[in-house]
Amino acid sequence: MGQKVHPNGIRLGIVKPWNSTWFANTKEFADNLDSDFKVRQYLTKELAKASVSRIVIERPAKSIRVTIHTARPGIVIGKKGEDVEKLRKVVADIAGVPAQINIAEVRKPELDAKLVADSITSQLERRVMFRRAMKRAVQNAMRLGAKGIKVEVSGRLGGAEIARTEWYREGRVPLHTLRADIDYNTSEAHTTYGVIGVKVWIFKGEILGGMAAVEQPEKPAAQPKKQQRKGRK
């Protein structure tokens, strides 16, 4: 059987950035990796209702900088920044170095694979029909400008005795094209019948120019100059 490689892993360094960007020598590497895992585990649990898309960790000079990408920055920050200050203290304790927490807003949650997958799982847990949840996610993504989307759910769908897999796809989802900007993520719905797995692939277009094009902020389009009409003398 043909197997699918992880769409994010194969594109790292080509059109996808890493979620942890730091360098460590052999002695510190394992400790850093462990603290990264614990920080992510804590933040994911603490901010379960804050629509967190991804957590990026950097380690500049004996400190840790955590960037939380979320669709609901208000919930993360809290009243007068109280919640984010509490998070900062706990992260500093876990990592053992001074911590800084930045918040990045996800402007279009319908085009973020993690948030789409989480939305479907929350609907499945509320006993919404799985086909309706999938179709709604596909329609919303295409309406907001996705070039293609594929949604797959797997498990005891609708409480069936035998587990099965169903999927919907609209538009193009080119998994082999390395320059294709494909956002992929998964989530799990814990229902009374068992666990239902959800996978989401969103194709946002092709990135020409590799990582340099990804890291550069988008420049505003130059306004065309109006040609001055010369009057008759």
UniProtKB/Swiss-Prot annotation:
Gene3D superfamilies: 3.30.300.20, Ribosomal protein S3, C-terminal domain (3.30.1140.32). The keyword Ion transport does not apply. GO terms for biological process: cytoplasmic translation; ribosomal small subunit assembly. The keyword rRNA-binding applies. SUPFAM superfamilies: Prokaryotic type KH domain (KH-domain type II), Ribosomal protein S3 C-terminal domain. GO terms for molecular function: mRNA binding; rRNA binding; structural constituent of ribosome. Transmembrane segments: none annotated. It comes from the Bacteria. Keywords: Ribonucleoprotein, Ribosomal protein, RNA-binding, rRNA-binding. One of its GO terms (cellular component) is cytosol. CDD domains: KH-II_30S_S3 (cd02412). PROSITE patterns: KH_TYPE_2, RIBOSOMAL_S3. Residues 39-107 form the KH type-2 domain. InterPro entries: KH_dom (IPR004087), KH_dom-like_a/b (IPR015946), KH_dom_type_2 (IPR004044), KH_sf_prok-type (IPR009019), Ribosomal_S3_C_sf (IPR036419), Ribosomal_uS3_bac-typ (IPR005704), Ribosomal_uS3_C (IPR001351), Ribosomal_uS3_CS (IPR018280). Part of the 30S ribosomal subunit. Forms a tight complex with proteins uS10 and uS14. With proteins uS4 and uS5 encircles the mRNA as it enters the ribosome, which may play a role in mRNA helicase processivity. Some nascent polypeptide chains are able to cross-link to this protein in situ. In collided ribosomes contacts ribosome rescue factor SmrB. Belongs to the universal ribosomal protein uS3 family. NCBIfam families: rpsC_bact. Binds the lower part of the 30S subunit head. Binds mRNA in the 70S ribosome, positioning it for translation. This is Small ribosomal subunit protein uS3.
